[in-house]
Amino acid sequence: ETGYQQAKSLLALEVRPDAIVAANDNMAIGTYRAIQEAGLSIPGDIAVVAFNDIPVAQFLTPPLSTMRIPGELIGEVAVDLLVERLNGRDYSKHVTLPTEMIWRASAKKPSAS
């Protein structure tokens, strides 16, 4: 619902965006609906990308381009950080986790230049 409402707001702007980046794949599903109801095509009129790479993303029409985020690893790292805090770590810690962009048909992959 949120992705749908947010996309409708963006599509109502005088200058429509070329692309919408949804916070997650579920919001992108609502975004697809709003774009299709407006009679626009993905990615011809507006590209859509999101985050998570849920299983259904590959079966949308067109298949959703999405950033694959390692959910299980995020959970493991979060627990490790919590245990460190409970054991007395009193400083901030920066953690970088691997991601992978999965290019499908909802957005064009940028050319390597």
From Swiss-Prot:
One of its GO terms (molecular function) is transcription cis-regulatory region binding. It comes from Rhizobium radiobacter (Agrobacterium tumefaciens). Repressor of the lactose operon. Binds lactose as an inducer. This is Lactose operon repressor. The keyword Heme does not apply. InterPro entries: LacI/GalR-like_sensor, Peripla_BP_I. The keyword Transcription regulation applies. The gene is lacI. Keywords: DNA-binding, Repressor, Transcription, Transcription regulation. It holds the Pfam family Peripla_BP_3.
